[in-house]
Amino acid sequence: MSRVLPGKSVNQTNRTKFLVELIKPSHYDDDGYLIQWWRGFVPSSSLSNLYGLALDAQSRNILGEDVDLDIEAHDETNKNLPVAGIIRRFKRNANRGIVLLVGVQTNQFARAVDIARELRAAGIPVAIGGFHVSGCLAMLPETPPEMKDALALGITLFAGEAEHRLDELLRAAFENRLPPVYNFMADLPGMEGGPLPFLPMKYVKRYAGALGCFDAGRGCPFSCSFCTIINVQGRKSRYRSANDIEQLVRAHAAQGVKSFFITDDNFARNKNWEAILDRIIELKRRDRLKINIIMQVDTMCHKIPHFVEKSVRAGCKKVFIGLENINPDSLKGASKGQNRITEYRKMLQAWKKAKVLTYAGYILGFPSDTPASIERDIAIIQRELPIDIMEFFMLTPLPGSKDHQEMYLRGERMEVDTNKYDAEHATADHPRMSAAEWQDIYQRAWHLYYSPSHIETLIKRAVASGMRSRRMTSMIFYFYGSHAFEHVHPLQGGILRRKPRTQRRPGYKRENPLSFFVRRTRETLTTYLPGLWFFHRLERLRKKIENDPASKHYMDVALSPVVDGEYDADLELYHASDSAVRAADQARARAEEMRKIEVRRAAAG
């Protein structure tokens, strides 16, 4: 069986063609326009996985020796989706084929159904899969209204993972017997030795930096109440082998892809992490492959022997860390007890010492949060934690999470518009903030963290740590600029916004071409001129700091080495709340107990 088959499909005139259109939908902004770019920033792991599975099915002639799969992929975040063209292709092929809307998150579900509605009106078979469908069917006692509406249109809903199941779906579509629902949530497939994720270069180049992606594993052992991963992918670690990863990397490298985003929710808890990193290190050494990696990890990864070191040797230049909050009560309430604030400084300094740029996700809206406490916590982070890039999220009860399930069962108010479940909108009531206050502090949090003085501090820390200052400023521009100028979250960001006039959300008036052109021109100028000026000032500041010899010796509280007994020091991180004081006391007690154990061992030795 072919594991990765990036070659051309065979299409001869005497053979039957079966169309497979893979679509990763975008979602709508607050004005009803699609969020779409000339180049996207974040690649779709689901699209890569489904394309690889479809290639494997193609190589095995699953529909018969005389039937060819004609596979096309579309990521709507970086490409105008040719719905009319797809309909024409299917019409020319007597509607033989299927459109699969893949990896559909809750905020993308409304757009996915809008696409499917047009296709179903033309008689084209359509299936929707992804976290929204899987999460709802896994956690809710009944099908939610938006999914019932999809079923009424004749759309097939697919819950679970497509490995070992795509063959059946394609055969059912080929034989015109698609059921309303596939539900494989009770049977999560193994990953080792299976078909591998792949996207041809013509698709990969639509992402900034030609960034490829793959999941080295799925599942997470933790139990965060706001997370959907554990209920959709399970808590048991499933992973690819080192041989799988080598074949995957080689296939991508053959077409010029050298940068990868490992999309595991927590690569540090992938039980095969060391073998995978060792193999990548060997590929870099033996085959001279230039490989760069971005990965996601937890706040305790630095305590895993050799994890940071081998990540760096494998090419890790940037790492995303689920910091979430610095209030232990908030972390405990979200069942995120694995995050210990007393380990934050050690963990961040371990990555800083390794010259790896850190991104930290921070959630606003835990029950104890107020605008004042959020402002205070951001100031503490700026002063005492050597985080590089911060990105903020509003606490959101995502379907598939325990939070959503419990709120649903209690009958609590939640936003009915799935398009707003993007972690940028208030989708539930907060006990201490109004929706307006919550929304306001979310907007201000970005400006508070990326203040002019702290941007200067971030660049100074980068230079003092031996990091590339240009990497720091480019990430500041991308993350802060996405919010400040494009008004979207960086994870939905990209280069040069497209805003197709004709693809506005149903219910919004389609603008007159002339008035749209005038407004869009004004909007473009007021977005990119300030953005370019900000970039100019960033570059000027970067060069100034680079050229200052004193910058290499810069030191502040965040960079100061962690020392024994620092829990008693004047660090507000450990004194900002009663729960922070308790966390420091517990860390102090653990350290003392470890000291006593070492003393006893030395005495016995």
Where are these regions (language model features)?
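Short helix-capping segments at alpha-helix termini
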Residues: N61-G64, L119-I124, L283-K290, A354-K355, ...
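Radical SAM enzyme core and accessory elements
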Residues: M1-L22, K91-R96, I115-A121, H425-G605
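Flexible glycine/acidic-rich beta-alpha junction loops that bind and position SAM and/or redox cofactors
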Residues: D29-D30, V133-M139, R165-L166, F222, ...
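Structural recognition of alpha->loop->beta junctions
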Residues: E142-D167, K310-K318, R376-F392
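Radical SAM [4Fe-4S] cluster-binding motif and immediate context
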Residues: E192-Y359, L364-F366, T370-A372, R376-A379
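Conserved beta-strand positions
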Residues: L22, L101, I128, I262-D264, ...
